[in-house]
Protein backbone atom coordinates (compact mmCIF):
# COMPACT_ATOMS: atom_id res chain seq x y z
CA UNK A 1 0.00 0.00 0.00
CA UNK A 2 1.25 3.47 -0.89
CA UNK A 3 0.41 6.68 0.92
CA UNK A 4 -0.11 9.96 -0.96
CA UNK A 5 -0.53 13.13 1.10
CA UNK A 6 -3.05 15.77 0.07
CA UNK A 7 -2.55 19.53 -0.35
CA UNK A 8 0.23 20.91 1.92
CA UNK A 9 0.80 17.68 3.85
CA UNK A 10 4.14 15.86 3.94
CA UNK A 11 4.99 12.26 4.89
CA UNK A 12 8.19 11.96 6.97
CA UNK A 13 10.17 8.91 8.14
CA UNK A 14 11.89 9.60 11.47
CA UNK A 15 15.68 9.33 11.50
CA UNK A 16 17.10 7.48 14.49
CA UNK A 17 19.07 9.55 16.98
CA UNK A 18 22.31 8.46 18.63
CA UNK A 19 21.86 5.75 21.28
CA UNK A 20 24.98 6.88 23.19
CA UNK A 21 25.53 10.23 24.92
CA UNK A 22 28.62 12.36 24.28
CA UNK A 23 30.05 10.97 27.56
CA UNK A 24 29.72 7.39 26.28
CA UNK A 25 26.61 6.51 28.30
CA UNK A 26 24.20 4.20 26.48
CA UNK A 27 20.67 5.65 26.46
CA UNK A 28 17.95 2.97 26.81
CA UNK A 29 14.95 3.10 24.45
CA UNK A 30 12.62 3.93 27.34
CA UNK A 31 14.60 7.10 28.16
CA UNK A 32 15.27 8.22 24.60
CA UNK A 33 13.14 11.02 23.17
CA UNK A 34 11.42 10.79 19.81
CA UNK A 35 13.68 11.99 17.00
CA UNK A 36 12.96 15.46 15.64
CA UNK A 37 14.76 14.80 12.36
CA UNK A 38 13.42 12.89 9.44
CA UNK A 39 13.44 12.24 5.71
CA UNK A 40 10.60 13.36 3.47
CA UNK A 41 9.15 10.32 1.67
CA UNK A 42 6.12 11.95 -0.03
CA UNK A 43 4.67 15.43 -0.56
CA UNK A 44 1.24 16.75 -1.48
CA UNK A 45 0.39 18.86 -4.55
CA UNK A 46 0.74 22.17 -2.70
CA UNK A 47 -0.98 24.69 -0.48
CA UNK A 48 -4.26 26.14 -1.75
CA UNK A 49 -4.16 29.92 -1.33
CA UNK A 50 -7.18 32.15 -0.68
CA UNK A 51 -7.09 33.19 -4.35
CA UNK A 52 -7.56 29.53 -5.32
CA UNK A 53 -4.04 29.19 -6.69
CA UNK A 54 -1.91 26.23 -5.64
CA UNK A 55 1.57 27.07 -4.29
CA UNK A 56 4.09 24.24 -4.67
CA UNK A 57 5.76 23.03 -1.48
CA UNK A 58 9.33 24.06 -0.61
CA UNK A 59 10.31 20.55 0.53
CA UNK A 60 10.77 17.61 -1.79
CA UNK A 61 11.13 13.84 -1.49
CA UNK A 62 14.53 12.95 -0.04
CA UNK A 63 14.99 16.18 1.95
CA UNK A 64 16.27 15.75 5.52
CA UNK A 65 14.18 18.00 7.77
CA UNK A 66 13.84 19.23 11.36
CA UNK A 67 10.41 19.42 12.97
CA UNK A 68 8.87 20.04 16.38
CA UNK A 69 8.83 17.35 19.04
CA UNK A 70 5.03 17.09 18.93
CA UNK A 71 4.54 17.78 15.20
CA UNK A 72 2.46 15.60 12.95
CA UNK A 73 0.37 12.49 13.38
CA UNK A 74 1.91 9.03 13.69
CA UNK A 75 0.65 6.49 11.14
CA UNK A 76 1.67 2.92 10.40
CA UNK A 77 1.86 1.88 6.75
CA UNK A 78 2.90 -1.71 6.02
CA UNK A 79 4.61 -2.01 9.44
CA UNK A 80 6.58 1.23 8.88
CA UNK A 81 6.11 4.12 11.33
CA UNK A 82 5.62 7.42 9.48
CA UNK A 83 4.54 10.96 10.34
CA UNK A 84 1.93 13.00 8.45
CA UNK A 85 2.41 16.73 8.98
CA UNK A 86 1.77 20.07 7.33
CA UNK A 87 4.69 21.76 5.63
CA UNK A 88 4.29 24.58 8.19
CA UNK A 89 5.34 22.11 10.93
CA UNK A 90 8.77 21.70 9.30
CA UNK A 91 11.29 24.15 10.77
CA UNK A 92 14.28 23.61 8.47
CA UNK A 93 15.82 21.51 5.72
CA UNK A 94 19.24 20.01 6.56
CA UNK A 95 21.81 20.52 3.82
CA UNK A 96 25.21 18.95 3.35
From Swiss-Prot:
GO terms for cellular component: cytoplasm. One of its GO terms (biological process) is chaperone cofactor-dependent protein refolding. Gene3D superfamilies: GroES chaperonin (2.30.33.40). It is found in: Cytoplasm. One of its GO terms (molecular function) is ATP binding. The keyword Transcription does not apply. SMART domains: Cpn10. The keyword Iron-sulfur does not apply. InterPro entries: Chaperonin_GroES, Chaperonin_GroES_sf, Chaprnonin_Cpn10_CS, GroES-like_sf. It holds the Pfam family Cpn10. Keywords: Chaperone, Cytoplasm. It comes from the Bacteria. PANTHER family: 10 KDA HEAT SHOCK PROTEIN, CO-CHAPERONIN GROES. Together with the chaperonin GroEL, plays an essential role in assisting protein folding. The GroEL-GroES system forms a nano-cage that allows encapsulation of the non-native substrate proteins and provides a physical environment optimized to promote and accelerate protein folding. GroES binds to the apical surface of the GroEL ring, thereby capping the opening of the GroEL channel. Belongs to the GroES chaperonin family. Heptamer of 7 subunits arranged in a ring. Interacts with the chaperonin GroEL. HAMAP family: CH10 (MF_00580). This is Co-chaperonin GroES. The gene is groES.
Amino acid sequence: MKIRPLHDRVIVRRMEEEKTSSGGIVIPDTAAEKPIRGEVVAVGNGKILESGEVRALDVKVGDKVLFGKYSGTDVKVESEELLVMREDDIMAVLEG
